[in-house]
């Protein structure tokens, strides 16, 4: 099912704001971008600066970008501003509707964006080796329950790390199929804490992407700012002796070429 949007929100094409692109593996955006139709009121969405940097680095105009857990549409907005075609998928109809609304603006040169209600574990509607770039930001287990248990298959309902990673592996396998060889898949994922102890969610997810055949190109540390829960958790952290997690991992994976000799990069593979 495709999420429908109405007429354009703006009469004139929007201009692409210029931002300084990143060149290190530590990214920090104290002020999240608010240009075009970007909004910060969808809990858990990522800063548009992340999408801008990844799309600029790993794709070209006219390429097709896929976000299989599109949320409020950050990836699709930036894809449109940068003249990339894009497909966004979300299992939550409310999120799909938000994304469809977010891309209701004119831009030149023209490109095509589409939002579908669907499950990232089934990308059979896409051809194999058809996508130029994947960029996504999945739920961090059940830290934020986007559908409150009402949508079957919603990853944000899963509280078990092994179960969550099993489902992520299914998604990773689908992404590996539809991504073109020698192209890139970027995923922003953070960690969590249980019983005052660190749970390495990000690295567990990373291992599942390596398992299906991806190789690790980059591990970018993204500093978190303006977290609404920081003030609430600070006294408890000081009292109980643990540190607040204030970073996320932006993993960039590459799909190897057919028959590619991976011996030189074997330590970036599933070993």
Briefly describe each language-model feature range.
Residues 1-271:
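Class I S-adenosyl-L-methionine-dependent methyltransferase catalytic core
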